[in-house]
Amino acid sequence: MRYHISTNFFKKKYSDCLVFGIFDDLQLCESVKVIDSGSDGYVSRLIKDNEISGQINESLLLHSIPNFQKLKILFLGCGKKERFNINLYQKLFKTSINIIKKLSVKALIYFVTDFHIKNINTYWKIRHAVSEIQDNLYSFKNFKTSNNKNKFKISLEDIYFYLSDHDEINSGNNAIQHGYAISKGKKIARDLSNMPPNICNSSYLADQAMKLSQYYPDLIDVEIINDIDMNKLGMNAYLSVGKGSKNKSLMSIIKYHGISFSQCKNIILIGKGVTFDSGGISIKTSRDLDEMKFDMSGAAIVFGLMSIISDLKLPLNIIGILAGSENMVSSMSFRPGDILTTMSGKTVEILNTDAEGRLILCDVLTYVERFSPEVVIDIATLTGACVVALGHHTTGLLSNNDILAKDLQKASKQTRDLIWRMPLFEEYYKDLDSNVADMANVGTNSAGMITAACFLSKFSQKYAWAHLDVAGTAWISGKNKGSTGRPINLLTQFLLNKLYK
């Protein structure tokens, strides 16, 4: 897909389809007035006949318009102007693309400046329009045969954003560049998450990391920590998770050098990369077990983010860690009742081998102390309890630092990539007490998302840390299962905000 800024919407090469927003006050923007006048009041007659109401969720596609026979016009209802918001704006692009995909349209033009949102500028509108369009054009057909692949082709090739103000052209072009880089990185993350576990294991993650460094040799260095190295480091909790699998655990460290100043501290992004989670000895039921390939979504998100960061050449120093492992059942698997000594020296009693993500993360959280980080954010499909508490719309946020938490909440509000902060009250820590070790790896049956984060917080006391539990938001379940790429939009905005502080 190619994206462009246009200041003239009547050029023949992109006159296949025009897309307008219309509010319920039915006031026509200047561009629609030109169409209305040129078609002898055709649009006005449709409004008079109640064919166009401007109500939210309403859409009307016009063909064979008088004096514009080859032109299609799509009107998208925006509802009340004072209630129009980011959420509704993003949904309109999903609606429009779902309609356009069914048409023989090679080029279309969006009149984004007519979508009025309070305190939102043209740059934001275009950047998020590109991102929403690319999201809704996404499909994962890598393992379909060539005959089947052809069924999913669409005719659309070029999308234009009309700007009447020439002073906004540079901003519009920047928005396209940024939006496309973000959506490209999101696609990379979704593709990686959607890969089958017989192909995507820890070695595959490491190979992808190495390819990224080859693509951006001046910006990225990669170090792969294998199981022998981890054993020397004392990362016994991490290693225990992969003991039952023939696929060895590997930790891929992607170092992005966006600025040469040594005083610029590192931002650390850690992604849980369990490429398949059987639950281990505490084995899961067979229902939806195929979806446990998505337990590496955190690592995929971090990988996608490192691609975005490199494309945008952000002047930041960022380290992304893909914590790869596979939790399988065998005679070599770790067991309930085992006591593990973590890299930090703290001991953990294993009560449930299906609470494996925190065992990987606790050692990685200790490992990253060597980088003297400014902030550390881990992204993990950690607990089913998060899904129970927040469902599939909202990512769980837990943090030991109010400033970091507020920065993430701000980015969430800017992108509407939803998160909700949960508490780390002292009372919850008691649930992790063990009579034979420093702590247990699970608490009681209640507040599972919180106690899991309490566990992690014991290993992240030397820096500002946030945990994003994406168990409910990283993928969609069921027949149409697939990765969502969340929370890439949020984390990209968080990093961009760092530049403007």
UniProtKB/Swiss-Prot annotation:
Keyword set, alphabetical order: Aminopeptidase, Cytoplasm, Hydrolase, Manganese, Metal-binding, Protease
One example of a Gene Ontology biological process annotation: proteolysis
Claim: Amino-acid biosynthesis is one of the keywords in the record: no
Residues noted as binding Mn(2+) 1 in the record, renumbered to the chain: D277, D354, E356
EC number: 3.4.11.1, 3.4.11.10
Top enzyme category: hydrolase
Cofactor: Mn(2+)
Cofactor binding note: Binds 2 manganese ions per subunit.
Name of this protein: Probable cytosol aminopeptidase
Lineage: Bacteria, Pseudomonadati, Pseudomonadota, Gammaproteobacteria, Enterobacterales
